[in-house]
């Protein structure tokens, strides 16, 4: 939703602690309301790619750390090491620390470890998401970022790929803003989502990348108001966000042509009103 609090600008909340890439903050709020932030990536002389993430607990105002940050330890790491995109979520009392592996060891994946303590140490368990591919062909690039959420009894992983920039399965390639006929694939990432499933022992099944995305879990109510961005499929339409400092972002839809531009919603329940 729209943020209401002012951003804390002009200063950091904690140092980088020798981490090479001091970026990709991941925010986790525990059941008791306590907030934690993870960050990091890359590799430095003091922080190799087996020890390149930090975690810190924030105060109640969420604008300063409580104590010093600590290294996120992941035991039993395989050949694929940690690159970036740290993220924590919790499921049935267990903490899951996930991250993107590096392209240096092959196609990047989203791997994870588990712990009974949010600060760790974690034990590596497996891969949540392989390199997004379809029909044996990668639809991604040299990295990935993700988020995990539970919604109405279902678990979902949101991630990025380059399926639109690559024109996967006939998808419409939207021209870059600079007028080029085809954008640079590496810098045009598409946001995708698929359902995620747990095994009985709490481990996560490797997510199947799909064209369709998750199944619809509720009917669409046509008698409510929705942003025009809401659709299950669209053609010839680009969504844009106009950002003005100090104001809420204005989201707009722009047709790419004067005809044959459309959007669709699915699973609509008209009830008895449509038939009288």
Task: Describe each region flagged by the PLM.
Residues 1-276:
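Carbohydrate-active catalytic/glycan-binding domains of CAZyme proteins
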């Amino acid at each position: 939703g729209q943020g209401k609090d002012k951003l804390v600008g002009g200063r950091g909340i904690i140092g980088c602690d020798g981490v090479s890439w001091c970026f990709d903050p991941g925010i986790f709020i525990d059941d008791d309301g306590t907030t934690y932030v993870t960050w990091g990536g890359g590799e430095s002389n003091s922080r190799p790619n087996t020890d390149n993430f930090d975690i810190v607990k924030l105060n109640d105002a969420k604008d300063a750390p409580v104590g010093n940050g600590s290294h996120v330890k992941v035991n039993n790491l395989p050949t694929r090491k940690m690159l970036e995109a740290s993220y924590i979520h919790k499921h049935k009392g267990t903490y899951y620390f996930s991250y993107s592996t590096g392209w240096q060891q092959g196609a990047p994946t989203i791997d994870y470890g588990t712990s009974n303590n949010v600060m760790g140490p974690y034990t590596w368990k497996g891969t949540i998401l392989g390199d997004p591919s379809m029909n044996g062909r990668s639809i991604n690039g040299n990295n990935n970022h993700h988020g995990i959420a539970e919604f109405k009894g279902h678990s979902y992983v949101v991630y990025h790929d380059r399926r639109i920039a690559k024109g996967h399965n006939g998808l419409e390639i939207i021209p870059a803003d600079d007028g080029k006929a085809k954008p640079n694939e590496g810098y045009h990432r598409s946001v995708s989502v698929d359902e995620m499933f747990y095994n009985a022992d709490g481990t996560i099944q490797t997510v199947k990348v799909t064209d369709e995305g998750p199944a619809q879990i509720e009917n669409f109510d046509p008698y409510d108001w929705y942003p025009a961005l809401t659709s299950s499929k669209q053609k010839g339409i680009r969504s844009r966000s106009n950002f003005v400092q100090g104001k809420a972002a204005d989201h707009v839809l722009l047709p790419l042509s004067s005809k044959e531009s459309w959007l669709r919603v699915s699973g609509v329940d008209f009830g008895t009103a449509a038939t009288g």
